[in-house]
Amino acid sequence: MSIRLRRRLIDLACRALQATLPTPLQRWGWAIRCEAAAIPDDSKALLFTLGSLCGLMPRAVASRLLTIFASPVGDHVSRPEGSTIMHIVNAATRRPRALGIVCLTSAVLLGTAYMAIAGAPMRYLGVNLGALIIGLTLLLLLERAARSGQGWTDGANLMMAGALLATALFGSQADGIARWVYWGGLAMQPSLILLPTMLVAFSRFRNVPATVSIVAAAVAMALQPDRAMAAMLVICLTALAVMRPDRHVCTALAASAASFAATLIRADRLPAVPYVDQILYSSFDLHAVAGLAVLGGLMLLVVPSVIGWRRAAESRAIYVAFGAVWFAAILAAALGNYPTPVVGYGGSAIIGYALSLLALPKFSSANALATAPKCGAIDDMPTDGPLSVALA
């Protein structure tokens, strides 16, 4: 990475920190900028700036989240000192989708911090940030489609399954494995974009067309073959079968288990790709700040699921599916040469995460904030009702 680029990243990080910090902490932002400017070694200055960013950003984000999530009534209620985190958790349960957007954005930024430290090409950072913009734009557009009441869920689910099958049959191949399509010179992995969305949606909206879509997706994973995505199917559907078994889940689980078994027959010999695979380990070898950025970003991916599980009794199946999907993606990246979702280079998982947020409730019951949870009691939190958007 050139000296000029390092200094630009330092300036960008300082500007982002100053824009995020609340007024009482603004002096810390200026102090970090001045200290970084006084460090002659550009690499050390960049590491100092990113370390300071990781140290101060949680407090800044906590302050902003409290403002974003707090209800108009809650803003006028006195809050006891030292309860900021608890208020954020309580308020976030009212807007699970917004919480997911915050987690996704934070994870992408942590991933770009890792790539900057690792010396990745500037284009890689731009690809991930561009994918974030595309994903959030699609999320906004599909939310509007949901409000318009278009009932095209079943047809679009079948179209997504068809896209996965088409990738297996006609996609770009490497060592006999067909998982990718090229768009604008960039390799995209449709399974990372579509499969998480299909699985989280299936947890809410189960019928024959949805089951056929999942079975077709399982066939596609066996044909590609893609062991990581087949494992995602098995892990998610097993969790749903334990939570709320029915004939649709059992049928889809049987097909997914057969798909995963088929992927085990053939060895997956694809080598690790820099900035994409195995970065959970290599980042710590590079620098502790880089490793913590990767680890923190991955942990953020399951935060909506953890909070939803604890606070939303009636929506638990949705949050279990969401958490199982992204836990499976993280597990695959940790165990083999598979893409590290969101924090590694590649836009497919970023777009896929954004789309999977559509299956989470946009708003939850305000009663969840009225009182703190009591021992043995579970807050009531209704779901949004039947899903009316195919990608949701």
Summary of predicted features, one role per range:
Residues 103, 113-213, 218-224, 327, ...:
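Membrane-helix boundary/helix-loop-helix interface segments in multi-pass membrane proteins
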Residues 3, 84-104, 152-153:
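N-terminal membrane topogenic signal
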Residues 158-171, 190-225, 232-243, 252-258, ...:
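Alpha-helical transmembrane segments of multi-pass inner-membrane proteins
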Residues 216-240, 264-271, 284, 288, ...:
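Helix-loop-helix junctions and helix-breaking kinks within/between transmembrane helices
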